[in-house]
Amino acid sequence: LKQNYPNPFNPVTRIEFSIPEPARVSLKIYDVAGRLVDVLVDETRPAGVYTETWNGRDRLGNAAASGVYFCRIVAGDLVRTRKMVLLR
């Protein structure tokens, strides 16, 4: 899981990640309190390099507030988290 770009961002950021073998991939956004904000990926993917976009909105389409968010990927045994900053 690479660092998102741009960071800080407004209104959109890109998140790049790679998986070395086919795996169930979960890529989720959390706020600083640990609450789930959005789910970007939740499916099985073949090995490869991927780029996902987060539009700074929650699962209901509401604009997320300015602040720190965490992007967490789980793919097989891989678990990584990166910090992102949304500036409105």
Per-segment meaning from a language model:
Residues 31-32, 58:
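Short, acidic, Ser/Thr-enriched surface-loop or helix-capping motifs
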Residues 35:
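Conserved Rossmann-like nucleotide-cofactor binding loop
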Residues 78-82:
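Extracellular and select intracellular beta-sandwich modules with Ser/Thr-enriched
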Residues 84-88:
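Short beta-strand edge segments in extracellular beta-sheet folds
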Residues 1-5, 9-30, 39, 54, ...:
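Glycine-centered coil/turn sites that cap beta-strands in beta-rich domains
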Residues 41-76:
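Short, surface-exposed loop/turn motifs with a glycine/proline- and acidic-biased composition
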